């Protein structure tokens, strides 16, 4: 059996060494650095071709299609049924800072309760009507008092608590409905408002009347980010409790959004340029152009204002629905943006330009003259701290990671593998073949290496693609090696198993043969071998002789019984 173990041990060693060879033979994953090719005595410095992005984690909250996943300017991204009626309700996962609803030609705030009873239609707003149980508006202090026995709710921040409060109420006529009311939180007054109406826009002479004198006509309204709404935060039922980690709030100072292109953050080439006098104005512009779920097809006529007014007075949702969510919204034009739109902008504070675009940014460019903003962001709040060490830290992490891999898998351990990062505050760390260029308008004292050939480029629609001549390195680069290695391992493993099984049978049979051979041999019981052999073969020998002897029929020792 020791031979079997020896064979298995040698086979395992063979597989281990084959794995090491396979890793060391991946020459396509590394490129020799030009300025270090002549270093024979020192460590070999090579450049990885893996295009990792050091901004990946930082930029996750700015991927608004994933983080918010619904309209921003108009958020009607979810359907809900109440009884036999279908409604569209807000569904965004992030707060929208500075968003409010403007009622045209009216001094009534949208945070005013809707008109009920004898009130005329335009005397009311969008907020929840007064009720016996005072649930809206309600201050954060009163909310905390209301839910003081609920430990989980007491852990929430003010915005999450307001959202949770509004979403906790279910319509009495349908307890199983997923319909929930949106909310608005006033950060200045620390007050939470539940909204009775989910609609955010109703415009055009066919659907509303801007005439302020016609108090019974349906009012026109639209979303906006004006100065009056700076302290407001628009909330859907789906806003994450940990939105601070998943959603943007502050604008980014000394920065502009860019695209990560093989080792450096580059300008977004295809943008829409708009005049803007301030960051606030640029933020308002990008909000107006942002993702919208507003339906574009309505029914032919909407003239029964008396019916609409009666709907408010009687709290009849079917009548209200016909005004705010017309029939066409649920037919061919039930549009859901899923967060896709012109959601990002770079504001040039020197030239007063606002550059808006609909491509998800993947990095930040350090520029003291710019601000990066989103349609979700606060109109004024700014974070001026640029993460200057992000490149240097990532280079150090990647080198340590590659060093560990070299120690595990490389025969030649005298190698340093550099990541494809060609910008840093430490110009020595990027190992540039030429003199790195100093970025003059950077607040972080960055150096960039521009003489290394890029393996990727920006094409139309701001799409980053790998250049044609390098595609072979990135089209499942490990797939062929892994497939080949897998076949080799399967073959070797199969051969080892066959050899092991054959060896097992061979040694087991040999062991049995040896055992029976020993049984056939004479054993020393005080007599010579020849004497015992003669006794065993002599049929006249006494079976119960006085001396002990082996049986000639069985391999056991028999003795004379005593009675």
UniProtKB/Swiss-Prot annotation:
Q: Which UniProt keywords apply?
A: Glycoprotein, Malaria, Membrane, Signal, Transmembrane, Transmembrane helix
List the transmembrane segments: 488-508
Q: Does the keyword Transmembrane helix apply?
A: yes
- Residues the record marks as carrying a glycan: 36, 107, 176, 189, 238, 441
Locations listed in the record: Membrane
Pfam families in the record, alphabetically?
A: AMA-1
Topological domain ranges for the Cytoplasmic compartment:
509-563
- GO CC, alphabetical: membrane
Recorded topology in the membrane: Single-pass type I membrane protein
Q: Which residues lie on this side of the membrane: Extracellular?
A: 14-487
Q: What InterPro entries does the record point to?
A: Apmem_Ag1 (IPR003298), Apmem_Ag1_dom_sf (IPR024056)
Top-level taxon in the UniProt lineage? Eukaryota
**Secretion signal: which residues?**
1-13
Q: Which Gene3D superfamilies does the protein's record reference?
A: 6.10.250.430, Apical membrane antigen 1, Hepatocyte Growth Factor
Write out the function statement from the record. Answer: Merozoite receptor PK66 is a surface antigen involved in parasite invasion of erythrocytes.
To which protein family does this belong?
Belongs to the apicomplexan parasites AMA1 family.
- Any extra remark in the record? PK66 expressed in mature schizonts is rapidly processed as the schizont ruptures, yielding a 42/44 kDa doublet associated with the surface merozoite.
Write down what this protein is called.
Merozoite receptor PK66
